[in-house]
Amino acid sequence: MMEGGETLSKQTPWDWMTYPFSSVKTDGDLLYAASPGNGIYCSDESGGWQHISEQLPAELVVNRLQLNQGKLYACTNEGLYTFEDGQWEQPTHAVPCYQYKTSGQCSFMSTDYGLWHRCGDGAWHKVAYPERKVYDFLNVPQFLILGHEEGIAVYDRFTDEWADFPLGVGVTSLTVYQGHLLGAGEGGELIVGNKGGGFDVVSFGNRLVFTLIRHGRDVYACTDKGLYRIGYLCGQITMFAVKLGFPVTDVDTHDGQMYMATLFEGIQQMDLP
């Protein structure tokens, strides 16, 4: 069993057959990875791996990792943790957190109690849907879009109104592909905006969609069967295989390489398609 602070080789970083990974992020030559129940790890340019979360509670569950201006943010079941210069900053609110993003000088996080917001180093405030779990969000010029436990909500800044779209399924991930709003349902569905003011909930047989990741113009779907790329076939949104053979939970890219967090195969690396 791996102990906190133990350095590990990059070739066999840990018992990769038993460690599931939920999130991966690249920061130059640094690679961060989170394993539910096992902590957060960092690989440096020398190829060594370090357990960096030994200061954090043992029962901590990391939902997502994010990077911004050299800081690592861990969205966890006990709040938003920040890692910088080898030290962790405790969350100001012990509220389960699922996503963190910035917009200018302001920050947003999705929580068990809606969407929260702060500017600069000010206090966090609830801004939308405090009665629902919000899993993900998109902040675009005209709209603020939430994926929550019952579906999707859209705030129109021009009309100052919210529109709620109950879908009968929680939406845990959001992105945009060629004008379509896309989401991942908590039951493994792909949620597709139909450009007609509604959404279609699409199932792909025995494939379960975990999350959607945008890279440039491409959108990738992490699934229980592997990694897929979103595209069109006969005018319909579909998924094209990129890398199959193991469940992929998250991806990130750097310098022409793609890094995949997997459930049973550790952190996998391949050339960017």
Short names for language-model regions:
Residues 26, 43, 67, 75, ...:
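Generic beta-strand structural signal
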Residues 37-40, 47, 77-81, 112-116, ...:
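Loop/turn residues immediately N-terminal
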